[in-house]
Amino acid sequence: MSISESPKKHPVLLIAGPTASGKSQLAIAMGIKTNGIIINADASQLYTDLQILTARPSDADEKILPHRLFGIQDGSEPASAVFWAELAKKEIKNAHESGRLPILVGGTGLYIRTLLEGIAPIPDIAPELREEVRSMSVEEAYSALQQEDPMAADRLRPTDKTRIMRALEVMRSTGHPLHYWQQKKTGGIANEIKLQSFVIIPPANILRSRCDKRFDQMLEQGAEKEVIRLMGRQLPADLPIMRAIGVREIASYIRGEIDRLTMIEKAKAATRQYAKRQRTWFRHQTDESWIKIFDDINFKKIDDFAIKLLSI
């Protein structure tokens, strides 16, 4: 994820960070300075159904600069990192062909990693084996993983059910540990572009305050009506759109299961917890080539960033 010196490679700007960190504002400011096109790299913002609750760009924002891959996927159709990465590659290519700078903006680390590093060519898991593994308790699965793939077990928390099950089913299905396949990733674009990455990591107390303020603003903008419309579609509860932050809490309030104050408290807590996980991920998963922004962004810094970017 470092800047390449090859003159044949086109530049790509990546602005990452947790929810409510100020990514969109920085992206627009940088895009104005660099003739950019903003490309969504946030899983929730792909979906058409939730503009307010996922903090998609406003109509005013989209009039300032072109925005791509926002609100393009119906909520009934779950998206994946691979699906998004293929679309992002096309949008990056289109931006370069039109003489503009592609600016990736988002907080979904898996999406970003898949685009840059590619995917591991893991063979399909037989449904019977998958069902067998996923019927185990997390304790049973972790114990089995410690025996069959101790390296994976050492990397995972004993309560991380999803990743434990995945590592165990891959080991049992292919006879190779997960890290074997991860070393064979293909399709990433990191070596084909000149990448400059920024990650915004506000202080924890400021991020918590921003999360709370943002949810209040979402309610003022009509988040409840948005969830009522979504509930009217009667989509399966396990779809990503139904698990978006705030949907479950607002839906519980609408059904009369909790009062309004409890709904607000629960939704804010869920937002803060999500932002905390993202903040931790970006602090530990990014290397020294990323420019880390820990404080408020001012116009002088934006000018400096733009000059640096245009010089690579």
UniProtKB/Swiss-Prot annotation:
Residues with site note (Interaction with substrate tRNA): 108
Gene3D superfamilies recorded: 1.10.20.140, P-loop containing nucleotide triphosphate hydrolases
GO BP: tRNA modification
Keyword ATP-binding: yes
GO MF term list: ATP binding; tRNA dimethylallyltransferase activity
Role noted for this protein: Catalyzes the transfer of a dimethylallyl group onto the adenine at position 37 in tRNAs that read codons beginning with uridine, leading to the formation of N6-(dimethylallyl)adenosine (i(6)A).
Protein name as catalogued: tRNA dimethylallyltransferase
